[in-house]
């Protein structure tokens, strides 16, 4: 069982390495609901969360925002009626770092 959800983000600099393909495959097993996507040439993790109404989706996005502030690592969030789409990636390195998988796991715990 993964402990990604219990981990915190490490400081990341612009020269930090992106996760390797092998690391991605291992880490994805810990966040199976998340998909790898490419947006604007950068690989990202994305998941769509569904809710019964707008208010529940909004409350969830507020929890994700609080988590992001706590960790100093911020996602893209699209809030719509009955759903919220969350995308994690590390802006400084233009792709995926282990921090993104940690935040995906922690986001899952909020759902």
From Swiss-Prot:
Does Lyase show up as a keyword for this record?
yes
Q: Which reaction does it catalyse?
A: (4aS,6R)-4a-hydroxy-L-erythro-5,6,7,8-tetrahydrobiopterin = (6R)-L-erythro-6,7-dihydrobiopterin + H2O
> What's in the keyword line of the UniProt record?
Lyase
Molecular function terms in GO for this entry? 4-alpha-hydroxytetrahydrobiopterin dehydratase activity
Entry-linked InterPro entries:
PCD_sf, Pterin-4-alpha-carb_dehyd, Pterin_deHydtase
> Pfam families, alphabetically?
Pterin_4a (PF01329)
Q: Is Transmembrane helix among this UniProt entry's keywords?
A: no
Q: Which domain of life is it from?
A: Bacteria
Q: Which Gene3D superfamilies match?
A: Transcriptional coactivator/pterin dehydratase (3.30.1360.20)
Q: What is its EC number?
A: 4.2.1.96
Task: Give the matching CDD domains.
Answer: PCD_DCoH_subfamily_a
Regarding protein family, the annotation reads:
Belongs to the pterin-4-alpha-carbinolamine dehydratase family.
Q: What is this protein called?
A: Putative pterin-4-alpha-carbinolamine dehydratase
Which species does the entry assign this protein to?
Marinobacter nauticus (strain ATCC 700491 / DSM 11845 / VT8) (Marinobacter aquaeolei)
